[in-house]
A protein has these predicted regions:
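Short linear motifs at protein or domain termini
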Residues: 1-103, 226
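Hydrophobic, amphipathic alpha-helical faces that serve as interaction scaffolds
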Residues: 84, 88, 100-116, 142-181, ...
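A broad structural signal for alpha-helix termini and local helix breaks/kinks
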Residues: 37, 152-153, 223
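Short loop-to-helix capping motifs
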Residues: 29-30, 153-155, 199-200
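Short, hydrophobic secondary-structure boundary micro-motifs
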Residues: 23-25, 121, 158-161, 204-205
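All-alpha effector-binding/dimerization core of bacterial HTH-type transcriptional repressors
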Residues: 71-147, 187-207
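Solvent-exposed, non-membrane alpha-helical residues enriched in polar/charged side chains
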Residues: 13, 17-18, 149, 193, ...
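C-terminal all-alpha effector/ligand-binding and dimerization domain
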Residues: 128-129, 162-234
Length: 234
């Protein structure tokens, strides 16, 4: 039953992302969904409960299930649900997350240098010994950015980053498999180490902004014109 429930949940999330089920409209009944997926109504009910907990849908009067306006009123649970239920994280949404990181990564990098330049330098000094493979770089890059977020003194930054950990893991094949990506990443570490060693917080901010912009633009170039751009909230 567990696998069947996951199958139903995944299919419904895919349909919601594609706009098959419109916000404000009723979802198909349990009976109809059970027939569609070839499972029991109990299995459908369990999947719907998970979607409701994540914020995709709401059960209203007379047990009518209505699709929420999740892009306008959802929260990070929606991202977690998408991560769990997607083989490949939607490229358009991934680009939006990279745009978000472009906004806050330079700030936590600057704050981290201001608060603990020696601590940041100590982490960055380990970069030269990293194996030149995607898995090692992904792990180190994640730990570096999380550490800088913590050292920034802003308690929200680590919470936001940790909410994206599953997404980041899924994106690693796009961000670190090519040699040019790894070379750019190592260049970023060397420049950041120099900035941290000098205690130059503003330089670290600018270096990080340039690096995040490079990753964003390169990601968009890899996918070309992104398909299925998310609609702007009404």
């Amino acid at each position: 039953m567990k696998k069947s429930c996951q199958m139903v949940e995944r299919a419904l999330v895919e349909g919601l992302l594609k706009g098959e089920f419109k916000p404000g409209c009723p979802l198909s009944s349990e009976r109809e969904l059970a027939a569609r997926f070839g499972v029991s109504r109990a299995t459908v009910r369990e999947a719907l409960q998970k979607l409701q907990s994540a914020g995709w849908i709401s059960v209203q009067e007379r047990h009518t299930t209505v699709v929420n306006d999740f892009w306008s009123h959802g929260d990070l649970e929606i991202l977690s649900s998408i991560t769990r239920n997607s083989e490949e994280f939607p490229p358009d949404l991934a680009a939006h997350l990279l745009e978000l990181r472009l906004q806050f990564a330079p700030d936590y990098a600057r704050r981290a240098i201001e608060n603990n330049a020696a601590g940041v330098a100590a982490i960055l000094s380990k970069a030269e010994k990293l194996r030149n493979c995607a898995s090692a770089l992904v792990k180190f890059d994640w730990e570096l950015h999380l550490a800088m977020a913590v050292m920034s003194g802003n308690r929200v930054y680590p919470l936001v980053l940790n909410s994206f950990s599953g997404v980041y893991s899924k994106l690693r094949s796009s961000l670190f498999t090519k040699e040019k990506h790894r070379l750019q990443l190592r260049s970023y570490y060397r420049e950041m180490l120099a900035a941290a060693s000098a205690g130059n917080a503003l330089l670290a901010e600018n270096i990080t902004r340039t690096a995040m912009l490079f990753r964003l633009n390169d990601f968009k170039n890899c996918f070309g014109p992104l398909q299925g751009e998310l609609p702007a909230p009404a």
